[in-house]
């Protein structure tokens, strides 16, 4: 019974740390770029788009398809960086315990 109480306490502490991590992820940002920096996007740790920069040279209507591709590529680049940051923070919180992404503790 003592082990169960210790496990419950540890799970509660881990849940609190995960809450702190979620709050921290709202404040961190990652920038992704494509086309040698002609398109850059900045996402917060939750994956929300915060900023988008498009080089004015890409404003040519004939380049619309390329511009769309570069925006998608820059967004995906930033998203990968955010996912890496989140995974690193999760490792710190869980002490290396590999939990599935998005797993909520039941305590």
From Swiss-Prot:
GO terms for cellular component: bacterial nucleoid; cytosol. Signal peptide: none annotated. InterPro entries: YbaB-like_sf, YbaB/EbfC. It comes from the Bacteria. Pfam families: YbaB_DNA_bd. It is found in: Cytoplasm, Nucleoid. One of its GO terms (molecular function) is DNA binding. The keyword Secreted does not apply. Keywords: Cytoplasm, DNA-binding. The keyword DNA-binding applies. Belongs to the YbaB/EbfC family. Homodimer. Binds to DNA and alters its conformation. May be involved in regulation of gene expression, nucleoid organization and DNA protection. PANTHER family: NUCLEOID-ASSOCIATED PROTEIN YBAB. This is Nucleoid-associated protein GbCGDNIH1_0260. It comes from Granulibacter bethesdensis (strain ATCC BAA-1260 / CGDNIH1).
